[in-house]
């Protein structure tokens, strides 16, 4: 190739490679704001009794508030787990409200959440 054609080609190619490299290095936020959700669920099953349901509720509620403040969504299961914790503490109305929120945010959970809500209302 003649030198005059090669220089613009090399320039364009280097620009494309640079743009691709910068895009790959960009900090991508995840789809959900996980907060302490995974740690809470893990601790609940791996070390039962280490953290009371009330302590877990406080942490998950704070995570939910933080996610809303950032315009993000808590992960799937967040409100279902919160509802379960409310159930454990006898707060059935709050449990149902959490299950309803899970249904709205994650429609694929509707069948399971409806079943749980139905059992709580009996």
Locations of the language-model features?
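Bacterial signal peptide processing site
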Residues: 26-28
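Residue signature of alpha-solenoid helical repeat architecture, marking inter-repeat boundaries
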Residues: 31-34, 73
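C-terminal motif of bacterial Sec signal peptides marking the signal peptidase cleavage site
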Residues: 21-24
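TPR/TPR-like alpha-solenoid helical repeat scaffolds
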Residues: 110-122
């Amino acid at each position: 190739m003649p030198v005059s054609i090669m220089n613009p080609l090399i320039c364009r190619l280097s620009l494309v490679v640079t743009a691709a490299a910068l895009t790959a290095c960009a900090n991508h936020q995840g789809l959900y704001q996980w907060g302490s959700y995974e740690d809470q669920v893990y601790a609940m099953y791996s070390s039962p009794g280490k953290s009371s349901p009330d302590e877990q509720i406080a942490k998950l509620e704070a995570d939910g508030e933080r996610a809303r403040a950032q315009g993000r969504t808590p992960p799937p299961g967040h409100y279902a787990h919160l509802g379960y914790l409310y159930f454990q503490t006898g707060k059935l109305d709050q449990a149902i409200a959490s299950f309803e929120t899970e249904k709205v945010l994650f429609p694929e959970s509707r069948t399971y959440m409806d079943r749980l809500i139905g059992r709580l209302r009996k």
